[in-house]
Amino acid sequence: MSSSTRSPYTGDTVRMEGLEFYGHHGVLAAETDLGQRFVIDATMWSCLRKAGASDDLGDTVDYTRSYESIRDIVEGPPRKLIESVAEEIAASMLADYPRVTEVRVSVHKPNVALRGTLRTVGVTIERAR
């Protein structure tokens, strides 16, 4: 969802950047057998006005709980594609937080097995209600 289509009350975000976990995702046998590091960025759009006024954790996105959910997915059952990992994370964030209207999830695979030099390979998805 582009910023031009968001309602004026969903421009607030909760961001989690650079979450690092060890998982066994990939197409190659070595990736699923040995595993590797994955780096996750997640942004969740939600009106934070009520949380700002109430100072109550129940009125916002609990990033400790979100971190644990993301960790469980990345460290959980192997997937062939990081696109699948990103989809599961996005679905989890939307399911766990009814106030979240949109999520953006990036999954980076910094140690991809390619013949060549690169910093990272990754995908970014955006999902909205």
PLM segments and residue spans:
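N-terminal, polar/charged subdomain of small-to-medium soluble alpha/beta proteins
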Residues: 1-129
